[in-house]
Amino acid sequence: NKIPEVTLITRPRRFGKTLAMSMLASFFDIRSDSKKLFQGLNISKEQQLCNDWMNQYPTLFLSFKDVDGTIFENALGLLQFTIAELCKKHTYLIESDVVDQDDKETFRKLKSMGSNLPELQGSIIMLMNMMKAYYNKPVILLIDEYDVPIAKASSNGYYKEMLEVMKAMLSTALKDNEALKFA
């Protein structure tokens, strides 16, 4: 069975999408030891599946739920903050000898919220490339509330600007990305 590269889960609000993605992140993340968490559940009976997938892949899990603002600059600042917080969870990457030096420099800027717009737009694919270099495995990308920045922008009058930012950020991460296992 071929796994689709990108899957979009569309369900109503309060349907459990965030919980499901959090569970998937715990299951896949190579930095976790989730055996006890899933012990006794039906999935733990699938030994081959667990051997192949449980804690076997670098996993990026982020949410855009807080990227909101009455003006574009505020929303962009919250997007920078979201990426900075994500970088803080992966600071081990800048200690590695196998990670590109230029990426490390950009990573530091993203982490301190000192990046420019193109660096912010390329942040997810850059993080994925760093993780792939570090682990020598493709990355599983889980994005929650991906539509919030654009929906909030639409209701606050900066739709075009936010669409440009999010389109660049997501298309580079999701389309023709060799560091992507699936999203």
How should these model regions be labeled?
Residues N1, I9, S26-Y92:
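P-loop NTPase motor core
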Residues P12-R13:
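The conserved Walker
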Residues K17:
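Conserved lysine of the Walker
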Residues A20:
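Hydrophobic positions on the alpha1 helix immediately C-terminal to the Walker A/P-loop
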Residues S34, Q39, S155-S171:
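Substrate-gripping "pore-loop 1 plus following alpha2 helix"
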Residues V67-N74, L78-Q121, P149-Y158:
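Conserved P-loop NTPase mechanochemical-coupling segment
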Residues C87, S123-Y134, E161-F182:
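Substrate-engagement module of ASCE P-loop NTPases
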Residues Y135-Y159:
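Conserved P-loop NTPase "ATPase switch" module shared by AAA+ and STAND
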